[in-house]
Every structure is written in C-alpha cells, then in structure tokens.
Curated annotation (Swiss-Prot):
Reaction equations catalysed: N(4)-(alpha-D-Glc-(1->3)-alpha-D-Man-(1->2)-alpha-D-Man-(1->2)-alpha-D-Man-(1->3)-[alpha-D-Man-(1->2)-alpha-D-Man-(1->3)-[alpha-D-Man-(1->2)-alpha-D-Man-(1->6)]-alpha-D-Man-(1->6)]-beta-D-Man-(1->4)-beta-D-GlcNAc-(1->4)-beta-D-GlcNAc)-L-asparaginyl-[protein] + H2O = N(4)-(alpha-D-Man-(1->2)-alpha-D-Man-(1->2)-alpha-D-Man-(1->3)-[alpha-D-Man-(1->2)-alpha-D-Man-(1->3)-[alpha-D-Man-(1->2)-alpha-D-Man-(1->6)]-alpha-D-Man-(1->6)]-beta-D-Man-(1->4)-beta-D-GlcNAc-(1->4)-beta-D-GlcNAc)-L-asparaginyl-[protein] (N-glucan mannose isomer 9A1,2,3B1,2,3) + beta-D-glucose; N(4)-(alpha-D-Glc-(1->3)-alpha-D-Glc-(1->3)-alpha-D-Man-(1->2)-alpha-D-Man-(1->2)-alpha-D-Man-(1->3)-[alpha-D-Man-(1->2)-alpha-D-Man-(1->3)-[alpha-D-Man-(1->2)-alpha-D-Man-(1->6)]-alpha-D-Man-(1->6)]-beta-D-Man-(1->4)-beta-D-GlcNAc-(1->4)-beta-D-GlcNAc)-L-asparaginyl-[protein] + H2O = N(4)-(alpha-D-Glc-(1->3)-alpha-D-Man-(1->2)-alpha-D-Man-(1->2)-alpha-D-Man-(1->3)-[alpha-D-Man-(1->2)-alpha-D-Man-(1->3)-[alpha-D-Man-(1->2)-alpha-D-Man-(1->6)]-alpha-D-Man-(1->6)]-beta-D-Man-(1->4)-beta-D-GlcNAc-(1->4)-beta-D-GlcNAc)-L-asparaginyl-[protein] + beta-D-glucose
UniProt record similarity statement: Belongs to the glycosyl hydrolase 31 family.
Residue numbers of Phosphoserine PTMs: 52
Native source species: Macaca fascicularis
The protein's name: Neutral alpha-glucosidase AB
Gene3D superfamilies recorded: Glycosidases, glycosyl hydrolase (family 31), Golgi alpha-mannosidase II
InterPro entries: Gal_mutarotase_sf_dom, Glyco_hydro_31_AS, Glyco_hydro_31_C, Glyco_hydro_31_CS, Glyco_hydro_31_N_dom, Glyco_hydro_31_TIM, Glyco_hydro_b, Glycoside_hydrolase_SF
Record GO terms (molecular function): alpha-glucosidase activity; carbohydrate binding; Glc2Man9GlcNAc2 oligosaccharide glucosidase activity; glucan 1,3-alpha-glucosidase activity
Compartments it resides in: Endoplasmic reticulum; Golgi apparatus; Melanosome
This protein's pathway: Glycan metabolism; N-glycan metabolism
Residues annotated as catalytic: 542 (nucleophile), 618 (proton donor)
Function in brief: Catalytic subunit of glucosidase II that cleaves sequentially the 2 innermost alpha-1,3-linked glucose residues from the Glc(2)Man(9)GlcNAc(2) oligosaccharide precursor of immature glycoproteins. Required for PKD1/Polycystin-1 and PKD2/Polycystin-2 maturation and localization to the cell surface and cilia.
PTM: Contains sialylated polysaccharide chains.
Amino acid sequence: MAEVAAVAARRRRSWASLVLVFLGVCLGITLAVDRSNFKTCEESSFCKRQRSIRPGLSPYRALLDSLQLGPDSLTVHLNHEVTKVLLVLELQGLQKNMTRIRIDELEPRRPRYRVPDVLVADPPIARLSVSGRDDNSVELTMAEGPYKIILTARPFRLDLLEDRSLLLSVNARGLLEFEHQRAPRVSQGSKDPAEGDGAQPEETPRDGDKPEETQGKAEKDEPGAWEETFKTHSDSKPYGPMSVGLDFSLPGMEHVYGIPEHADNLRLKVTEGGEPYRLYNLDVFQYELYNPMALYGSVPVLLAHNPHRDLGIFWLNAAETWVDISSNTAGKTLFGKMMDYLQGSGETPQTDVRWMSETGIIDVFLLLGPSISDVFRQYASLTGTQALPPLFSLGYHQSRWNYRDEADVLEVDQGFDEHNLPCDVIWLDIEHADGKRYFTWDPSRFPQPRTMLERLASKRRKLVAIVDPHIKVDSGYRVHDELRNLGLYVKTRDGSDYEGWCWPGSAGYPDFTNPTMRAWWANMFSYDNYEGSAPNLFVWNDMNEPSVFNGPEVTMLKDAQHYGGWEHRDVHNIYGLYVHMATADGLRQRSGGMERPFVLARAFFAGSQRFGAVWTGDNTAEWDHLKISIPMCLSLGLVGLSFCGADVGGFFKNPEPELLVRWYQMGAYQPFFRAHAHLDTGRRGPWLLPSQHNDIIRDALGQRYSLLPFWYTLFYQAHREGIPIMRPLWVQYPQDVTTFSIDDQYLLGDALLVHPVSDSGAHGVQVYLPGQGEVWYDIQSYQKHHGPQTLYLPVTLSSIPVFQRGGTIVPRWMRVRRSSECMKDDPITLFVALSPQGTAEGELFLDDGHTFNYETRQEFLLRRFLFSGNTLVSSSADPEGHFETPIWIERVVIIGAGKPAAVVLQTKGSPESRLSFQHDPETSVLVLRKPGINVASDWSIHLR
C-alpha cells in the first residue's frame, strides 16, 4: 500500500509540474506579469479607433423634429452628418435624483446587447417636461428636484444643471462615436491586418472642424474592424465594428474614484498620454502595481467628488471597456442659451471622462447626489446592496493551495485549538477534487468528506471547497456528460462545444448567461447531487473571468457563442457575475431558501455585491502588495462591493515573519479576512512562527473576534442602505481636502480609524486624524487626540494603530472563543467614546446569524444607543424587528468621562438600581460593571 501511495504521489507531483510548465509557456511566467500577453489600447483595434478621434465639434446632430415626449421618457433621433446613419437617444428622469441616457441604432442590422440581470428592478420614473425651446435647443425639467437638462441639437450635446449650476455635460468634447453596423466591404479581402500596424484611422472631425466639412469624405473600415489577430489568436468579427464611446465633462471636479479593479491608488489618475484604465475581467498572473491594466473584475462606476458635491456615472456595458481621464480648465460660460443658467465668470477646474466599449449600446446612469451618501443609495437602488453574510464568514479563514487530505485538514483544525487561536473556516483548493472534477472528492485523499465535515461542525467550524466554472472534458464524468447532452456549454463560432485549457486539462465552459444553465448549476449544490457535502460546506468560485490558459489574454475567444446568439465579446464582463449568482442560488436552494449562502468569487461586475464576497486575487508576499490592498478594497467598497479582502501573507512567495504579522494586523481590520498561499510556499499556520510572532497574531485575531458585533452591524447597515463598510476618509469628511487622496488609512463605519503599518522595520506612522472640533481615542491606551491633525505615532511590532472617534459607541464581545458560533450568545460590552460635547451614539444588529429569518419573519434586533446629558439610553431603532436572545449587557466602558457620584440603572417596570463602577482619572475611563440587562430591552443608565 505504501508503494501504491508513493506512486500516486509522484504522479500528482508530475501533473502539478506539467501544469506549471504549461503555465510558464502560456503565460510567460516571470517574477512579474508579462505585459505582452495583455493588450494595450493601441493593440485593441476598437480602443485605437475610438481614441484616434480627437476633441472637436461632434458630427452628430439631434433632429428636434423627431422629438417625442412620453410619460416615461423622451426620444429624439441623432443624425451622423457624414454617414447619415440615425441613432435614437432616450432620456429618462428617474426618482432619487438620477438620469438615464440610452443611445442605440435606430434601425440596426442586428439587435445590440443590452445588459440584463444587473438592475434589481426598472427604476421608477421622474417625468420630464419641456420648459423651453428654440431652433437649436430644448430645455427639459425633471419632476423631482431643481434639475434641468439642456439638449442642444447641433452639435449634439446634453448639459445637466441644478438650478443655474452646471453639474455635467455629455458630448461637450464631441467624442460620441457609435460604430454602426454595416455589410462587409468586398474590396477589403477576407482578412484585415493585425492590430497595431500603424494604419491611419478613418477621417473624423478634429479640433476646429465643422461637421459640414466632413461631408463627402469616404467612410473607411479600419484594420481590425472585421477580423484581428493578437499573438497567435484570431478573432473573427462577423458583425464588424460595433464599438461605442461617449465623453462626460465634470466642471468643478478634480478628484474621481472607482472603476475597479485596478492595482492602483484610490484617486484615479489622468490617463492622457498613457494607457486608459481598462475594464476586462482577466486572470493576470503576478499582477503589477500602480498601473491601469485590467484585473479580475470590472465595475463600470465612476464617482466624482469636491467639497460641495458628489456625482456618479454608471456605464452599463458588459463588453471590454476603456476609460480615459483628463484634467482640464473649463470656462463657466457656455454658448447660446446656457449663459442664462450659469453664475459667475472665469475658469474652474474640470475632469473629463471618456468611456469606450467594444459592443453594446450606450446605457448610462447619472447619479446626481448631491452627497456621497446619496450617490451610494442611488447606485444601490439600481444594482442592489451588499448581501448580509452569515456571521461565521466575518471570522478568520485559513486556506492554502492545498491541504493534502482529511488528516491534514483535521490537523490544521486541531492546531488552532492547541494554540488557542480562533478560526471559523478551513479551505480546500483544486487538489481536493478527483482529478479536478468539481463536485467530487479525491477518493484516496478525501474518502469520507462528510465525516470530516461533521468533525469540523462539532467544533462549530465550516469548510469551503473550490468549484471552478470549467469542467473537465471526460466521458463518464457526470457533470460533463450532462452539460454536453443538454447543450449547456459555450459554443464556438461554428456551433461545436467550446473547449479550452485549464486546471483539469481540456475543459468545457458552462454558458452561465443561459438561465437554464444557472438553474442546472444551482441544483448541483443540493446534498443529493454534491455527494459528501453538508450544511457547513460553502463554496469558492475561482477562475470565473473566465480563465482559459490557452486563450487570448488567458481568457475566452471573443467570437465564442452564448445563449441568445450573443458573442462572448458582448457578455465577457458579466460572465463572472452569473457564476457567482448561480452558486449563491444553489446554496440558498439546498436549504429550502432558509440559509444565507457564503460564496467567494474572483471575477465580478456591477451587482455582484448581491451574491457574496470578492478578493484582490493572486497577490505577492511583498510590502507593496500589503499597501495596495487598502486602495483596492476601498475602491470596491465605493461601488457597492463591501465584502472585500486580500490574501493575508500574499499568495506568491514566502513572507518574512514581520510582513506576515503586519498582514494579519491589517487583515483583522478588513471586511474579508483570509490567509491563503500558493502550492509552492511554506506552511503558514500561525503557530509555526516563533512564539513572539505567534502571540502578536493571536492578539490580532482576538481584536477581530472581539469586534464581530460591530462588523456584523456594519454589514447590516451596508445591506440596508448601500453604504460602504471600509471607507475612505473623505466619505465621512467630504469638505476636508486633505482626505481626498489619502489611501493608506481608512474608516470602518463612522467609528474606527485604522492606519495599518505597511513598511518594513517601521518605528512610527503618520496618522491623519480628521474632523474640526472632533476627538479620537487610541483604542489601546485611550489617549485622546484632537482633530484635525497629522500625528506621528510610534509603533512596535505589536502595534495596530486604531482610533475610535469621539461621539460613537462600539459593541464588542470580550470572550474570544474557538469560532464565532461559540461566541454568538456571549454578553456585550459597549465602548462609549464621548465627543467634546459629551455625546455618543451607535447601533447593534443581532439575529440568528445564518438564516433569512431577519428578512422573511422580521426576526432581528436593531438597537440604538444614545449618550447625552450624562445618560445612556437603549431603544429600538426598528420597531418592526423582534428577536429573543439571551445576550445581556455585561459592561459599559465610557471613554472621556469624569467620575460620577453614583450610577443608576432604570428599566421599565423595575425600580432604580445602583451600578458599581470604576474610574481611572489618568485615562478618563469610566467602567460600569454588570448592568445585567437583556440587550433587547429598553433601559437607561444615569451618571449622577
């Protein structure tokens, strides 16, 4: 038996080596990404064509005679004065201060793709009315708010105003470009030259051109319009060039954010003269930092901020997209009738944003704020809010590629107990499956998965197993056979099943754009279909960009065919969302709709927040990768994806102990907290480090678990209101210009400010404490600091600089146990940090931690705590909720308080009772011991 096992082990190692060699050939493995494997704008024919068009007068003219105003929208035809092709513009005023703009061909040869399943519902209409008109413009008034839209006919332009203040302009730079569908030109030949060959672009209006001067110029087809080649991959384009582009001008705006995912600073940079930001979901091996290259996910939402206003642009398009950003100075006056609406004179800074997508229609939502909280709610009303996760998923996750077998998993589980370290979840990567056949278990290494799961369940722990969306092509493998027989794979352009190369070798790719496919996939997670699964097994969807090792840019051919006859180029960026959606639906359905799912996915799109968590992908054990996780997760939170984290310790390479310690300290204060590592790295169980490092990691884990009631409440607030959990400082302090570019520290909710230590050998950090007239308390020493100021804070290896804002109340669990489920009924301690005015407030959300009963049966508690006038009051913040719980208030810690003569507790129906207390005059901390009141009850505590 030993010899058989040894042979099997050698075969597994040989296969792993073969895959790595293959990856080295396909991906050009080096110490960093091989950029030549991924397109630049110059190598993307549609981006090159779009970008070749320079600002000037637009060739499009709105035909005002065609204008029709209905109860839901206004439509008007746009005429290209060179090609004479007609487009149709549809304008909608929406409730909650939003506007929608859609542009499509009036008579397309073939319908263009309109992105489904991202919007949670048709947004309610705020009717438009015509309030003014002349020969070249129409003034529209929105039914809600002081908003007007000026539609200028020639050249076509839209200006959106609030009263007399210009908020933004559409096509002010004349960069609207809509490549209409056409028949192939016979003279062109069967193939176009490869992209990037230096051919001249078609003639379009340039600076100073008049639209009529371009009339009569022949319309040409660019190289790459009908077929293009990248490296060895040929992309047929049977429908020809279909790209769309449009510009937006934002006067008064110098700071813009969003459009993740990029490994870059929080504030977006000017791209003119360089590469635009690219949105195209890709498996990028060992990605570089501080550049606009595409990564695993795409959310086409851009936010603009200044001290007085916030705006958002949501570009609803699932095709490959590039975004150019430029900084200009714009006059406050405009031609024609616009002068009547504007105030002042002179110049103002302006940011111009240009969107360019390969296919689809132009479908854009303008989110008009006026505050950033309003913008968050507006976007959430369109695409939904962050799913409320099960409580366990907010604990610590231990993962690597791969734990060898059942004994290894249970040994890791035992390691946490033996070393008094909390942990909620252990993860299994691709090696757990039988030959990487997902929904199976390797019979030699995981022969009794259900027994293993039961052992973990007895410790109140969970297991996450990877289920990737590529299926091994293997006759006799039930998953493959059913998908092939049902015709549910993505097809090639000739109608056969598309096959690519991934972890199992030759693999088919399920067509998740097909609702039938998604239903089939969801059903696979039933306990009957997923043999060996149990209620404490959850799922990880990796590689869902989709990743195709031998495909162009490590992804699928763009001319692959999907449900409904759409090409992959139309749907690429939404594919990962559909995988995430179907998996989350499956976990929900397996419990009869009772249990909340937990699914981690790598690729994402607008709306992915409804289905679970994401992470920043395959990072590296380097200090700069530790740093970059902050702006990466901040950017994701700004566009709705709050459940974000980075692989603690770095996926590639072996971290030095100091780096690993600092990463645990940071991870403890990020929404998703998972350690993960590559197959070739050393084991990283915290107990394997020297004791001095292990002790510090234990403390970081303890801080995470102590704050779980606070984290859970933040997630409920994000779920309810759409506000991010991990926030840039400017979100809370919108008028403080100093905060606008800070991305090495952040807020959790409005209560905690975190400045991780992210430099090797650091002896101190510079912390900016914002807020005029506010105070901040170090959560360890309780030392008080006044804002605004930049504070030099000395640090040791055990330091995690965290401050609680005066005026907030943070709930904690003070008994750290082996998992969150072991703590869920523990008593609560309230940390009350007083403002200079002697006030504070906070919330606490509680439910059963795992079902949808909070939603379907209103079984929850939302308590509001308010301290004012030396009295702390607990009341219900949502009377519709009801939930019986044994949790009680164990202590109240009041920071910044004087010593009272007495402390009195009042509860309804009971006489007053005195509480024991202890006051520390050096720290001004007052501790009230054992009020002993149920957290669900109304009560007040008076300091006398």
